[in-house]
Amino acid sequence: MTGTPLTIAVGFDGSPDAEAAVRWAATLAAGTGADLVAVHAVGLLEHAGIDGRATAHRQTVERIADAAGVDPGRVTWSVVDGDPCSAMLRVTGERPEIGLLVVGSRGAGRHHGSVLGSTSLELAERAHVPVTIVPTGRA
């Protein structure tokens, strides 16, 4: 790793686990001077209500980042078509400055009874950058 702060990508779907991931990533970004990119994946069936939901999600991310002390100019938002795993992999592939991917242990789909959701497991296996999976209730 170089002396330049990396960019941290964090997945956000509005779930409590995703909020914990944003808190963890924002705290790290504030402490290191890194940029923070929040990524929200939008599936085909979600497009109808995306405007209101995306605005609410963006405001939540901005509020959490502000509380952690992240400079507002260092926080960006990306809405990406596709399933959450594909969207996160696409963003990290298209943006070489991203050096860390942060996700919650389970997202909005929640597989009850499992410690990790399918997206976090798949990202841990397939991502080309380090992945931090924030456990439920942490951050």
Where are these regions (language model features)?
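Structural beta-alpha unit
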Residues: 1-3, 17, 68-101, 108, ...
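Small/aliphatic-rich secondary-structure junction motif
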Residues: 2-51
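Short, well-ordered secondary-structure micro-motifs
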Residues: 21-22, 48-51, 87-90, 113-115
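Active-site phosphate/pyrophosphate- and oxyanion-stabilizing loops and adjacent acidic/basic residues
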Residues: 26, 62, 90, 121
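Short glycine/serine/threonine/alanine-rich loop segments
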Residues: 32-35, 70-73, 129
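General small-molecule cofactor/ligand-binding pocket signal
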Residues: 37-39, 76-80, 132-134
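Short, surface-exposed alpha-helical segments at coil->helix boundaries
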Residues: 51-62
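Glycine-rich, Arg-bearing micro-motifs that act as flexible, cationic patches
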Residues: 100-126, 139
